Design a protein with these regions (language model features):
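Active-site-facing substrate-recognition patch
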Residues: 1-64
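PRPP-dependent phosphoribosyltransferase catalytic core
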Residues: 2-15, 137-210
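Phosphate/pyrophosphate-binding loops at sites that engage ATP/ADP/AMP, CoA/4′-phosphopantetheine
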Residues: 57-69, 136-142
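Solvent-exposed alpha-helices and their adjacent loops that cap or buttress functional pockets
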Residues: 64, 111-115, 163
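Short glycine-rich phosphate-binding loop at a beta-alpha junction
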Residues: 66-75, 150
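Conserved acidic residues
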Residues: 69, 117, 147
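Short, glycine/charge-rich flexible loops or terminal/linker lids adjacent to PRPP-binding catalytic cores
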Residues: 81-120, 128-134, 187
Length: 210
């Protein structure tokens, strides 16, 4: 996995899918300020990178979860990657909202999921894990087993790690915060002062101030 983590980190940085702005931080949807941002949606615009992610996520699932019956994407950002991976593995696909919709059929799970199926969840990136936890719970409430979660990038927040461990769910990222930051520094994308700032943020993102 280490070689894969290194390769994925370098490719994401070359694609400029991960941006760093310690002095002009981004605002996340949950209100946190962050000196970095993973724009993994850019991957979909570049066929070679898109194929790389598709093949590697599929390979991880095939090796770690050979008994998977179905692939579930976390709505909405992981739907595209989930579909690509399911197609590669010739597996059925569903996607799951963090909450049931308030219109139409009011579904939380979109597609056909039968009780007792074994599910692998595809997430585009893992940060707080709040929505991911809701998706896992919804799948389990449908009488199914969550084999594990695969993702492109993991921020590695300690609170998220504890949350997934408590839920007894394994997480396998193609790359992670430490690997990306190390390569960003080596490639001259960030300097040492910026690297230290970003590391401090990652230790306590909810209370970080620039």
């Amino acid at each position: 996995m280490k070689v894969l983590q290194e390769m994925t980190a370098v490719r994401l940085l070359q694609l400029k899918a991960i941006k760093f702005q310690p002095k002009n931080p981004f605002t996340w949807g949950n209100g946190w300020t962050s000196p970095m941002y993973c724009d993994d949606r850019k991957i979909l615009s570049y066929p070679k990178m898109r194929d790389f992610i598709r093949l590697e996520l599929a390979r991880v699932i095939a090796e770690m979860y050979p008994d998977a019956d179905i692939v579930a994407g976390v709505a909405t950002n992981a739907i595209a990657h989930g579909v690509l991976v399911a197609e590669q593995l010739s597996l059925p696909f569903i996607y799951v909202h963090p909450q049931p919709k308030d219109h139409g059929l009011e579904n939380q799970i979109e597609g056909d999921l039968r009780p007792r199926q074994s599910v692998v969840v595809v997430e585009n990136q893992v940060n707080t894990g709040v929505n991911l936890a809701k998706v896992i719970e919804a799948i389990r409430n449908n009488g199914c087993k969550v084999l594990g979660v695969v993702t492109i990038f993991d921020y590695g927040f300690s609170a998220t790690k504890r949350k997934l461990e408590k839920m007894d769910v394994s997480l396998t990222p193609l790359t992670n915060f430490e690997t990306v930051l190390r390569h960003a520094s080596a490639m001259g994308v960030i300097d040492e002062e910026q690297k230290e700032t970003i590391e401090n943020w990652q230790q306590n993102p909810a209370k970080w101030e620039k």
